[in-house]
Amino acid sequence: MSVGSVFNRLWARITHDRSIGFGLEHIGLTTLRYPRAIALAVLAFSILCFAYIPRANVDGDLMRVYAHSGQYYDAYEHLSDTFGTFENDIYVLVSSPRLTEPETLERVRELAFDLELNDYAVGTMSPFTLRKPDGLGNSVPAVPEGMDDFAEVAIALADLQQNDPMMRNLITPDLSGMVLIVFPNQEMTKGDGTKAMIASVRETIAYYADENISIELTGPPIWTSEMLAAAVNDQIKFTVWGFALGAVIALLALRSLPAALLVTATPLLAVMWSMGTVILFFGSFSFLTIIVTTLVLVISFAESMFFIFNWLAYWRDGMEPNKAVDATVKLVGPAAALTMLTTFVSFASLALTPGQGVREFAMAGAMGTFLLFVCLMTFMPLMLKAVIRLGFKPPRRSSLVLTAPLPLAWFIASRFGRPLSIAAIVVTILLLIPYGLIQPRFSFEDMLAKQSNALTTAEQIDDGVGGVAPLYIRVPLAGTDPNVDDTDFETIRRVHEILESHIGENKVISAANLSNYTETGFSREEVFDSVGPFMRKRFITDDGSQALVTGFMPTIISSATLKQLVQDVTTEMEAAGIVGAEIGGLRGLTTFGTDQIVSGLQLDLTLSVLVNLGLIGFAFQSFRVALASAIPNLFPVLGTEAWLYFTGQGLQLTTVLALTIAFGIAVDDTVHFLSHYLHSRREEGRTHMDAVKHTLDRIGGAIVATTIILCSGVVIVTFSELPQVALFGTLFVSTLAFAVIGDLFILPALLAAGGKFFQPLGRIRVRTADHDATPDDPTGDTITGTGGTEGHSQPG
């Protein structure tokens, strides 16, 4: 055989001598030919995945979402490594109306010392741990010990709160509350250590809380623990309710409990495979990858419903049930493979945006999509043939609810196809305007669990002494004096003043605060020695080359306000001749980093749309098919983004994720519709309009059923305790709801209106179904009957 001949055959395989599923449906054909071998493989892989499921856990590290996402994460990591930050600290708010009574003050002092001795703490900062020079080369407690008079305590605390820059951030102005900050041991808090640390701290404070003293915890570790608890609760809720709703809807649609259980079995196994694989590859779920199991669940339900509907229709057409299984694999398999590829592309496109969290979500989703297709092509045929042997009897008919919209859809398509098509095209083009104008928007509050007690406590601290959402400025110094020379001290003082002018008086701490002591005659070395090496590192590096200025902002601040603040502070520092200063912190990372990630994801969404439309056109070897699929699938995505734009919600992280994945899934129904339409034209010889009507009758009910299952399964997500996850569910459901309008009304109208334009589709060379011989179907018969969703005849 010549090289040219080999090349021609290879080229033909790539272009037209193949199915629309690029041959991936041969996984199903292999199952039909070698059922025992495939059954063993399915069993072995299931055992592997089941072995990993008991290890399932959710990683509460918020940094996993932003890790390696770009310059803002790198700056935060460098800042944390150089100085340590307050982002991992636990804030303890102690409140008492009798705080100025000596007995109460000493009890709070004991609490502060107990927290310092906690196994998980490497240090604390509180009014009791701060010390000041005594003028004799030693230091004494900033809050004097041994006071036994109410007035003496009140005068001492008031003096510290009003005159000591550090104490202003730890003692409330009305002297009714104090903030104690616990610095955790980062090595001990890795993995499940944070949960154990919080439990240990709660155990410590429980001894001191009574009717006189109220103690509450807040800070990033508490926030993430609440988010983690909400995420775990969500995972259980989504899985249980998703299965329950899917099964109930399948029961109502098929009007048969055994048939509903058949629809449910494949999604159950697909979710188990997906969970086991995520744990195998990533070790744990993140706040993003936990959504993947719900997506795999609902997509599996949708594909299972398509498979069961087609199988029952063949059976009702009079085909022998085992042969009907084979025929369904050959007809549905190529379309299912193509829908898997479009969803796979939607997930995979997200990996182009930097960030460990997004890339893990993309990889987990892509793997889950492929696994559910494999499950559909292996487990489903094996299960159906097994239940046939056990005497399964199909339901006599499906629910009339599923087919109720079909006569209206055909009436509109046949009578008003052209005006509806023109309107759909014009509206879709106009919706491109808000798509290009919409901007990222970030709200830190949306990341936290709803009704967060820790958030309420943080807001109380904001109102009292400062904030628990620090903004940091890393200031490069010219000298190398570990105790800071006069020139460098002036640089620190100037940055301190600039930041304080923007976030409020007494909301900033830095080495400049020490001037309160140096002005009374103490040297900087004496003052630095008195605060101790741990606190010293929060002000300046050991070699004196860098300083840290920390501003405590309100916990809840809009992203627009924060961006403007950073811009103004940067401009003023540059005007003051301070070069190389770097602003960072968790709030800066989540605000600017999220904007960067969201902008990248918006480009990924655009790329996903273009690639998927191109993939559909290439799969069918027809640009006409790509054009036919464009409007019904662009309309729901662009419509949802327009709603976000006009309501001022903007783009958020989960917004773009939801739209990208929803587009990939919405394309599924379109692919199944076009596949059946072209099968009717090419292989059954139907006319153009007859093929449109036959396709609408044959799979319209399945499209309605799958959309109901998809929306019902994901609507559970809208009740998540995490606002970002709830928003994901809301947008996902609304996009799919619009998509069913596109597939049942707009797509048939486009096909009907473009009769001459779509006429050549009857001559496409790629196969919409396979005709390979299998044991129960040696002739490769995939001709569909004329009885629509219900088939031509009732099986006995």
Question: What are the residue ranges of the model-derived segments?
Answer:
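Juxtamembrane segments of multi-pass membrane proteins
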Residues: 65, 71, 77-78, 82-85, ...
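Hydrophobic, glycine/alanine-rich multi-pass transmembrane helices and their short helix-loop junctions
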Residues: 249, 337-378, 613-617, 639-650, ...
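Hydrophobic transmembrane alpha-helices and their membrane-interface caps
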Residues: 259-307, 625-674, 742-745, 752, ...
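Extracytoplasmic
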Residues: 77, 106, 149-256, 493, ...
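Signature of alpha-helical transmembrane segments and their immediate interfacial
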Residues: 5-60, 381-386, 390, 394-443, ...
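Pore- and gate-forming transmembrane helices of large, multi-pass membrane proteins
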Residues: 235-237, 264, 303, 316-353, ...
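Interfacial segments of transmembrane alpha-helices in multi-pass membrane proteins
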Residues: 233-285, 352-356, 603-648, 719-720
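Hydrophobic alpha-helical segments
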Residues: 270, 274-390, 720
